[in-house]
Structure formats: structure tokens, C-alpha cells
A protein has these predicted regions:
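A short helix-turn-beta junction within AAA+ P-loop NTPase domains corresponding to the substrate/partner-engaging
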Residues: 54-58, 167-182
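Short glycine-rich substrate-engagement loop in P-loop NTPases that contacts/grips substrate
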Residues: 71-109
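Conserved AAA+/SF3 P-loop NTPase catalytic/coupling segment centered on the Walker-B
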Residues: 100-101, 106-134, 165-167
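Conserved Walker
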Residues: 119, 136-152, 163-169
């Protein structure tokens, strides 16, 4: 993916925004986009994916979202139920692992754009809980004892409505751009 982002027919980007996007893409660091609601932060990720010819994987964050959900979730209740019903799938623990959006991005055979939308809605520790995974582009699945590594490092676009401050350690790892209200 050697294409550069120059905006699209439906998204007019400022020069500063183009520089931020292309720096993040080229240097493989997350791009943090802040701005008021309705300024086009989420649409920007969609347009970056279109311009680069990349699939878009969207992870919309809520106040209850935990970082672990982006990696995977282990459904122990379903496994217990299946064991009581004599289901043979119970012997393979991977049958009860539900892949999260980061895993989906890491599994992509082509370089995707991963949108982590409205990160500031989550708990204050949420961004720090993703630092290692976003830096190394890998994580460990404890239940199956396997390490999941990104096949292609995704273009990571993170949006924030500036509702709360993000941790300094997280901010230092991102390229940043503020979109002003038109």
C-alpha cells in the first residue's frame, strides 16, 4: 500500500491533515484525530480506507467497553453449557474464543484501516491497556497459549471527542491532528 492520502471527492482534507495521515501511514504509528462531534473524524477513517484501497475494520467504543474485548473474549458460560449437554466441541477450547476487532485486523491478509472510534468514551485506563498491543502488533491468548501477530500492520485511526484527557503515555505514541468545526 504505497498510495498517499490526498483527500477524496467526498472529503476535502487540509494540508495539515494530509501530512498527519501520510506520516501515520508511512511511519506505521496510530493517528489520533480529535474534534467536536460532527466534524468528520469517523468519516475520515472511511475515506482513508477508500483512498488506500484497504478494508475498514470499525471498533466503536462505549463507556462499558474494555480493551480485552478488542482482542478476544472467552465464552466460559457457553463451554460449561455445552459440557453439560455432552457437546463434543467442548474439548477444543478455541471453539469458545470470540475474536475482537484487533484480532480481525491482525488476521487481515491485506493491510486494513482499523478505526477505534471515540476512545475517550471508555474508562481512563482503556488507552493504556492497548499500548503493548498497538506497539508490538501482537497479543497472547491465555486460554489457547498462542500468540496472535499482525500479518500486516494495520493503519490505526483513533478518534476522540475530547470528552476526557487521554494518558500521556498513549499520546506520545500517536500522530495527532485536531479537526476544527467548519
Amino acid at each position: 500500500m504505497k498510495k498517499r492520502f490526498e483527500g477524496t471527492k467526498s472529503y476535502v482534507a487540509t494540508e495539515d491533515l494530509k501530512v498527519a495521515v501520510n506520516a501515520a501511514v508511512g511511519l506505521e504509528r496510530p493517528l489520533l484525530i480529535k474534534g467536536e462531534p460532527g466534524t468528520g473524524k469517523t468519516v475520515l477513517a472511511e475515506e482513508i480506507a477508500k483512498a488506500l484501497g484497504a478494508p475498514l475494520i470499525q471498533w466503536h467504543i462505549k463507556s462499558t467497553t474494555k480493551a480485552q474485548q478488542g482482542l478476544y473474549e472467552y465464552d466460559a458460560v457457553a463451554r460449561l453449557r455445552d459440557s453439560q449437554l455432552g457437546d463434543q466441541r467442548v474439548h477444543e477450547i478455541s471453539n469458545y474464543i470470540v475474536k475482537g476487532k484487533l484480532w480481525e485486523a491482525f488476521d487481515s491478509p491485506v493491510r486494513p484501516v482499523l478505526l477505534i472510534d471515540e476512545i475517550d468514551k471508555a474508562d481512563i485506563e482503556f488507552p493504556n491497556d492497548l499500548l503493548l498491543e498497538l506497539d508490538r502488533m501482537e497479543f497472547h491468548v491465555y486460554e489457547t497459549k498462542e500468540t496472535i501477530r499482525a500479518a500486516m500492520r494495520p493503519v490505526v485511526v483513533i478518534t476522540s471527542n475530547n470528552e476526557k484527557e487521554l494518558p500521556d503515555a498513549f499520546l506520545r505514541r500517536c500522530f495527532f491532528h485536531y479537526i476544527k468545526f467548519p
